[in-house]
């Protein structure tokens, strides 16, 4: 029997003892790391193969306690992965769950960066900040290292899988991964259904707070359009980190949100195999993972960035797999690869800052700003027509203007918008170009949505504000008026055909 496999099984058996002493856990993991290191000469040394052009180490902290080992491929594809080793937040298993992946990834043209993060010892911000710093360095150095800064993923193993999922669900746009790979991940922070030491080491005293436990059980933090696509790799016989209450819950949350997610669940393998060749399904796993990575197409770096801001109609409420089938996704297909269209819609949101769910309080709003769009399509107002929200109608204009001038500060003084053109030249357009969409008709008064308020209150204000700032108006209320047959039963939300119709209308305007 392979010594690595045997060692892994011994560790798993020891760790199943509920009242084991922490020293036993640390000792077995340390012994495993020694065995892994002893086996390493059988593999090509990363950094000394034809696939790796450069191997070097960078400090992530001033004291050098956190470092990042960098592997740059000979033939870069533009894709990069930040690797997060496991080890129960007690040690770092950074060979089979770290550097061992370098040669395979570099062969595919993928730059690879292993973060040897500091252990939390109850302070979760310590490892989180180390990984964030790694992402900043990779994206800041993208041009020099041959990387597309919007094609940087994360790959974590076990407790490192938990940390990778935290980074994927709890990060601001600039340090959020573009895709996620989770090997047998710890997801739950409830030690009754998860790995006890990972929970205790990551949360410390906060493990006593049910709200914190829920927040960092990352299946609860998945958000539509925001949480990046994921691939989850597990074995059904994993007795250390139960798949049903960990990795499978993350997959379920992703699927319920409509986000892209692939689940690879093998019948055997236990826990802790990583990129080790002793895993019985090693070759099949790499082949499938490779295909998944190949189909993740990043936007062109010079693509025209289009931000679709809106409520549930933009979000894709009621449309299965809305990130693929909602109007922004269909708009992307219509506009083609020269554009990068992002969905920043959030259901139930209002333009009004005193509404029941103000859009400008949302993560999606911060993301839209960080996206630095060239074009913004704003489609808000439907929920503002509810009586409980429209009672603040006197503030609708100022809130709309606040959104516009935050997106484009140069419009804060309307008389100065745009640059003066030289004689014989057209004026350079203000960036981003902002399109105000009137709400589509409310074919029914579901949820107190009032089409009369939309027509007589909201749309006139939108048109006046557009005229003041020199913005274009897309009159969806008029252009969609004959498409009542493309609605869900509630009469408020378009179905997938209605989303396509909306995309067609908007695409025609953007192409003018």
Language-model segments: which ranges?
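C-terminal catalytic histidine-bearing segment of alpha/beta-hydrolase fold enzymes
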Residues: 248-300, 496
């Amino acid at each position: 029997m392979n010594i690595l496999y045997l060692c892994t099984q011994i560790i798993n058996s020891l760790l199943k003892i509920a009242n084991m002493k922490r020293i036993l856990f640390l000792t077995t993991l340390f012994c495993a790391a020694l065995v892994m290191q002893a086996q390493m000469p059988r593999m090509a040394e990363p950094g000394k193969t034809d696939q790796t052009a450069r191997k070097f180490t960078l400090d992530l902290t001033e004291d050098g306690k956190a470092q990042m080992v960098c592997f740059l491929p000979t033939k870069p594809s533009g894709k990069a992965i930040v690797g997060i080793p496991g080890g129960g937040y007690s040690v770092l298993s950074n060979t089979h769950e770290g550097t061992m992946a370098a040669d395979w990834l570099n062969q595919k043209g993928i730059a690879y960066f292993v973060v040897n993060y500091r252990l939390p010892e109850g302070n979760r911000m310590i490892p989180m900040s180390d990984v964030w710093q790694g992402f900043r360095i990779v994206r800041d150095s993208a041009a020099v290292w041959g990387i597309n800064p919007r094609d940087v993923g994360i790959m974590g193993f076990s407790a490192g899988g938990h940390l990778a999922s935290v980074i994927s669900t709890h990060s601001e746009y600039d340090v959020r991964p573009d895709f996620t790979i989770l090997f047998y991940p710890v997801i739950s922070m409830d030690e009754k259904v998860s790995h006890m030491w990972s929970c205790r080491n990551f949360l410390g005293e906060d493990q006593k707070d049910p709200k914190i436990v829920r927040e960092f059980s990352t299946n609860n933090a998945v958000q539509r359009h925001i949480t990046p696509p994921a691939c989850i790799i597990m074995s059904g016989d994993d007795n250390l980190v139960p798949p049903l209450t960990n990795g499978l819950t993350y997959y379920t949350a992703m699927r319920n949100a409509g986000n892209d997610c692939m689940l690879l669940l093998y019948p055997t393998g236990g826990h802790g195999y990583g990129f080790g060749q002793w895993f019985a399904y090693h070759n099949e796993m790499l082949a499938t993972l490779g295909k998944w990575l190949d189909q993740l197409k990043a936007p062109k770096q010079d693509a025209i960035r289009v931000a679709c801001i809106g409520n549930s109609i933009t979000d894709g409420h009621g449309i299965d797999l809305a990130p693929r089938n909602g109007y922004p996704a269909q708009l992307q297909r219509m506009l083609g690869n020269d554009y990068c269209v992002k969905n920043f819609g959030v259901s139930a949101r209002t333009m009004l800052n005193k509404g029941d769910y103000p859009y400008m309080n949302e993560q999606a709003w911060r993301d839209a700003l960080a996206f630095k769009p060239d074009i913004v399509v704003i489609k808000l107002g439907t929920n503002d027509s509810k009586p409980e929200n429209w009672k603040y109608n006197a503030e609708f204009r100022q809130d709309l203007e606040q959104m516009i001038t935050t997106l484009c500060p140069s419009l804060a003084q309307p008389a100065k918008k745009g640059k003066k053109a030289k004689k014989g030249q057209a004026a350079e357009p203000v960036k981003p170009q902002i399109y105000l969409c009137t709400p589509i008709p409310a074919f029914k008064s579901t949820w107190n949505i009032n089409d009369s308020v939309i027509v007589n209150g909201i749309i006139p204000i939108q048109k006046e504000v557009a005229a003041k700032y020199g913005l274009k108006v897309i009159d969806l209320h008029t252009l969609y008026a004959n498409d009542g047959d493309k609605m869900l039963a509630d009469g408020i939300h378009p179905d997938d055909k209605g989303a396509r119709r909306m995309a067609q209308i908007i695409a025609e305007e953007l192409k003018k």
